[in-house]
Structure formats: structure tokens, C-alpha cells
Amino acid sequence: MPHRLTSFVLAAAALLVWTGTSQARVTKIVIDNKTSPAFCTGSPPVCPSFGDAGQYETLTGRAFGELDPYDPQNALITDIALAPRNANQKVTYIASFFIVKPIDMTKASGVLWHDVPNRGGRVTITTDLRAFGDIGVSSGWQGDNAVATAVPANASSPTPVTPVNNEWVKTPVLSGVHGRIFGRIINRSGFGAAPLNVMGNPIPYFPVNPMSNDGATLTIHTKETVNGFVTEAGTVPNTDWKFCGGGTFALPAPVTTLPVQLCLKDGFDPAKLYQLVYDVTDPYVLGAGTAAFRDVASFFKYEAQDDATPPTPNPLAGSIKWAIIRGSSQSGNFTRHFMHLGMN
């Protein structure tokens, strides 16, 4: 029988146990794919057992949820008051999830590791945790990365969608709402167009007017310290750059798809950082993704079934004693933010 520091697990769980709320909840789940047994290799397939827990299976699916924008636990979400509502006057979301669990749930340990995906990357609990009978859930929270967390076109379909190997969340979009953001371009050279990024991800918003850069400010920076202090080396005149969808300053392609790019008259210098402050339109209510992460864990820990007709049973019902969030790097930043908002 594997051994671990039970007291450590209990202490961590005590700090990070989700509490249920009637004003924010998953109302429906759809299981898109089930592999049982899982982790098989070879031909004919050999399917491993893990300690006393035996064989495992995986489930891929989607959670449909709704948020009461007036509930204090949700009202702290930026711009939720502006979000579109459903017939119940709730704000909705759809989040993907991936479950790793024992086939025989009587062998489950009661510990659920709710892993935070890093830029959409799916997380699978390791073999040592499977040997304990632990359960793993990876679910979507990031609604603004158009690459690894791109939302499937048929995400709202009540029928199964083709499984993908990443996590995503569909959050509300504020149509017609404008706001100011900044983006960066680094390590680029030459006269070709360069995409606007933030933290390595393409910015998923269109400028209010892609044909004009009025009101936008493009600055050049030569140094940045570890504590974020940036040395400004000047401002690029608006006559010397433009929004584009590719090409060059002299022959720009129109802005029709994301990510939005910049074309620079004098070209880009790889030794410099370019930072643009500009107005965009149709932002996401990104905090709904944070609430979705909260609600998915709450559903799997507390609920017996969803609200659909006929209802879909919770595949983890009655098996979870402790739900523990964890993450590192970007996922660690999310975990800290999650706890700071009081969503655990």
C-alpha cells in the first residue's frame, strides 16, 4: 500500500476546500468522450492497474453554468453587470473538463486534485497519485487565448463534440463595449508585420477602428528590470506605423482575423521592446472563467446530478472529501488570484 503524508494532504485540503453556492452553479454537464480502461499501450493493448485503486478511466466533457450577477460572490467579476443574460437573468458560461478516476469508485481516496491548466494545457494526475486512488480534474478558466484555449465552434451543442487535448472556457462577450489595453512586440526584426502579444499570448481583441491609429500610443523601450521598471526610449509617430493583418507598412494586408499585427515604417529592432496602448472593442468577461473553475469543482464535489431533463449523473458523486487546487507558473498566479478573490 503506498504511503504519503496524510496530515499534509488534510492541511492543504482544509485551506482549499470549495464551498457551494446557490447563485452560481453548473446546471448541465455533457460527457463527450469516455476511455475505460485508460492509459493502455501496445497492440494488443495492455491496460495498467495502479496500486490498490486498480484500473483508471478518463472522461472528457463540458460544464454549462450560470452566474447571478447580483450575488456578492459574482458581483466582484469585472464588467459582469454589463454581460448579456439568459431567460433566467443569469450570465452563462461553458467550460471544458477532463476527469481521471478509478473505474471502481469504491477504491477512490476521496482526494480530488483540481489542476489549473497553463495556457490551456491539459493536466493529468501522475501515476503515484493514481496508486493512492486520487481523482484528477483539469478544467478551463482562460477565455482569452485564441490558440491553446480556442473555443470549439460547436461548444454549445447538446451533443458530444470532438475531444481536444486542451482546456477552454466560453465566457460572455460585451458587444459594442470599448476599453483601453496594451500589447507588446518583442524579439522581432525586419519590415514584416508583427503580432501584438501580452505574456506570450496573442491579444484576442480588434481595435475599435483597424483603419486608424488615432488615440493610440506606440512607445519604444530599451531596458526592463526584474521588478518591471521599463526604460522608455521614445514614441513612434502615428504616421510611422499602422494596424495590419500582415504584409509591410508599404503593402499592408487588411485586418480581418486575429491576432492583430503592426506594420512599422522603419522595421523592428530585435534589441527593442515595442509597447502599444490602444482602444479595443467587444471584450470578454474573463472573470466568468474564474467562476467557472470554482463552480466545476463545486459540482463534482457536492452534486448528485445536473439539472437537465433527463439528468446526467455526476460521475464523481459522493466520492470527494477534499478538493485541492494547485498550479505553478501562470497556473500559480491564477491560484493566488483565485484565493485573493475568495473563490475557494
What do the PLM-derived regions correspond to, one by one?
Residues W18-A24:
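Sec/Tat signal peptide C-region and signal peptidase I cleavage site
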Residues M1-V9:
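Bacterial N-terminal signal peptides that target proteins for export
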Residues A24-N344:
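C-terminal His-loop and adjacent cap/lid subdomain of alpha/beta-hydrolase
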